[in-house]
């Protein structure tokens, strides 16, 4: 499995600004206080800010706000356990394979492909030694999907002895994938 690490940018800087709402002497005690946070640039990280209970004091009391920050890494973990197949390796890896072969037709921009990716990875681990799993990027290898009539992705095809036996289109539940794969176990 690939390991991802997250790094954060320089810390957040805070500025406070006080403005007088009214210029009349009787209302001079009314002021508006604003907190500005200058956030660092972020690439794939979300910075969550939350106020501490001490900052939720009454409006009439002087406020001291303490800011607590947490950086959360939301990089989707991907695995490299599933071998990649392309137009040039298709015949040797899929058509000439002994036993059942599952090919996941996907693209990096496809949202449903990203949704089903963890399921396919789990199934590849579960069926290790029984079924071979491959991934084919339809953007990088457009000939093979065209040859097999792949019109939408994600599409999962099951091959046995070089022949297409089953096709599953779309992001389906794990139970649907499992029931389709179980039919082709040796």
Swiss-Prot record:
Domain Thioredoxin span(s) in chain numbering: 73-186
The record's Pfam families line, in alphabetical order, gives: Thioredoxin
Q: Where is the transit peptide?
A: 1-72
**Location within or outside the cell:** Plastid, Chloroplast stroma
Q: Which key words tag this protein in UniProt?
A: Chloroplast, Disulfide bond, Electron transport, Plastid, Redox-active center, Transit peptide, Transport
- GO MF terms, alphabetically ordered: enzyme activator activity; protein-disulfide reductase activity
Transit peptide: is it a keyword of this entry? yes
Instruction: State the active site.
Output: 110 (nucleophile), 113 (nucleophile)
The processes (GO biological process) annotated in the record are: positive regulation of catalytic activity
Q: Where is this site: Contributes to redox potential value?
A: 111-112
Site (Deprotonates C-terminal active site Cys): residue numbering on this chain: 104
One GO term of the cellular component aspect?
Answer: chloroplast
Q: What intrachain disulfides are recorded?
A: 110-113
* Summary of the function given for this chain in its UniProt record: Thiol-disulfide oxidoreductase that may participate in various redox reactions. May activate NADP-malate dehydrogenase.
Belongs to which family?
Answer: Belongs to the thioredoxin family. Plant M-type subfamily.
**What do we know about how this protein assembles, alone or with others?**
Interacts with G6PD1 and G6PD4. Interacts with PGL3.
Q: What is this protein called?
A: Thioredoxin M2, chloroplastic
